[in-house]
């Protein structure tokens, strides 16, 4: 009864247009007030504990680093390198766009930031070289989803905070899937470009490739600093986020000099707005998770599933369907915060690795970002290209099949996500 009332209140609040954070907090408050033996003081305590959550401290720093990279000329240099490296292939500019998205994802941790940073540069060039606006928009919209799969990823940090798994293992688990999805998108572009008979630009010389690589070196070095620092035991993922923000500030202002000190207040303000929005959702979601735990809702669901004899593959199928539906109506952070506390204990009971479950959830969130009506990448791509939302949706949907095939591979071949972290850290 308590479970039904909690979720009815939650979805009723969201259905009438209430923000996700307030919906989570209000439904939790009413459940505690009416049904729980917890005191209302536990709410304020839980909200205060959120501000002390060490893992969550990584979020504002990764947000700031991503914004500095977006506005500091790093994306522009990454695009030049990608075009020099693979631009001569069939569909080379589009393939270079995917590669640039992969590179920028490795320093930004955000899908919308990746779409804006790369899309605003490459789409104009693609149109000048004979690509249709629909083709360009579809590629960038889908390739931009790599921003939350290739580490560092803000969504992965949130999942790790909610489920208390290792952020380092989550980051490492995203490397191979991120590269695989990038290669699958490149292969799809190559095949489609053959149908359209697009003429690639001339092949760059090794000198041009090397020059572009050197020019983008300082931006690419951030990936080495973050991942090398974490796995070399130099600093924790949270400390790595702080280092990445300081490093991004340094190269944007003093190395590339694309930002001046006058530009910094605007960057800090935008980063603060994003951080406040995310942390307000996280705080209320952790309160929601607290109610779930005290009422033993996840444990009760897990026991029921085990009793009916549901196989792990069946559970993962149900999880994918549930997440794909949720992705149509909610943004990734909200979905992770609401569903991870419920799915995590069930997966553990069925013997499914929590890291594997985390990657499955992230891939589903990627798909949700390119599906209407609230797919965030659709809105961002619309703003970058000047196309209306329906046009962007039609342009993105053909490429969605690649993401769905990739989801099946990641779901039922766990070694794709678990192989590298198990090799590095041990099982």
Task: Say what each PLM segment does.
Residues 1-427:
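Alpha-helical transmembrane segments of multi-pass membrane transport proteins
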């Amino acid at each position: 009864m308590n479970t039904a009332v909690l979720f009815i209140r939650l979805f009723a609040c969201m259905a009438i247009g209430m923000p996700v954070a307030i919906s989570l907090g209000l439904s939790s408050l009413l459940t505690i007030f009416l049904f729980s033996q917890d005191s209302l003081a536990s709410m304020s305590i839980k909200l205060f504990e959120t501000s002390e959550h060490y893992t969550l401290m990584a979020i504002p720093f990764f947000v700031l680093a991503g914004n500095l990279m977006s506005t500091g000329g790093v994306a522009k240099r990454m695009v030049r390198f990608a075009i020099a490296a693979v631009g001569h292939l069939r569909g080379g500019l589009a393939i270079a766009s995917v590669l640039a998205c992969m590179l920028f994802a490795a320093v930004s941790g955000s899908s919308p930031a990746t779409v804006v940073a790369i899309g605003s540069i490459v789409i104009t060039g693609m149109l000048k070289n004979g690509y249709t606006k629909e083709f360009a928009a579809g590629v960038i919209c889908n390739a931009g989803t790599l921003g939350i799969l290739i580490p560092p990823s803000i969504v992965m940090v949130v999942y790790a905070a909610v489920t208390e798994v290792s952020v380092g293992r989550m980051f490492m688990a995203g490397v191979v899937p991120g590269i695989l999805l990038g290669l699958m998108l490149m292969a799809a572009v190559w095949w489609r470009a053959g149908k359209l008979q697009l003429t690639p630009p001339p092949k760059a010389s090794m000198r041009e490739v090397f020059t572009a690589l050197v020019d983008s070196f300082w931006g690419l070095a951030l990936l080495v600093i973050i991942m090398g620092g974490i796995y070399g035991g130099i600093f924790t993922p949270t400390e790595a986020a702080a280092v990445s923000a300081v490093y991004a500030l340094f190269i944007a202002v003093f190395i590339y000099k694309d930002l001046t000190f006058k530009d910094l207040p605007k960057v800090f303000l935008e980063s603060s707005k994003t951080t406040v929005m995310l942390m307000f959702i996280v705080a209320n979601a952790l309160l929601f998770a607290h109610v779930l735990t005290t009422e033993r809702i996840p444990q009760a669901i897990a026991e029921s599933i085990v009793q009916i004899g549901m196989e792990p593959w069946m559970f993962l199928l149900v999880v994918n369907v549930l997440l794909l539906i949720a992705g149509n109506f909610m943004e990734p952070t909200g979905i992770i915060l609401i569903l991870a506390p419920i799915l995590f204990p069930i997966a553990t009971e069925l013997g499914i690795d929590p890291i594997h479950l985390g990657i499955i959830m992230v891939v589903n969130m990627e798909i949700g970002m390119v599906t209407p009506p609230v797919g965030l990448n659709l809105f961002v791509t619309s703003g970058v290209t000047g196309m209306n939302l329906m046009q962007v949706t039609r342009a993105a949907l053909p490429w969605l099949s690649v993401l769905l095939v990739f989801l099946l591979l990641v779901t039922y071949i766990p070694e794709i996500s678990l192989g590298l972290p198990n090799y590095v850290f041990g099982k």
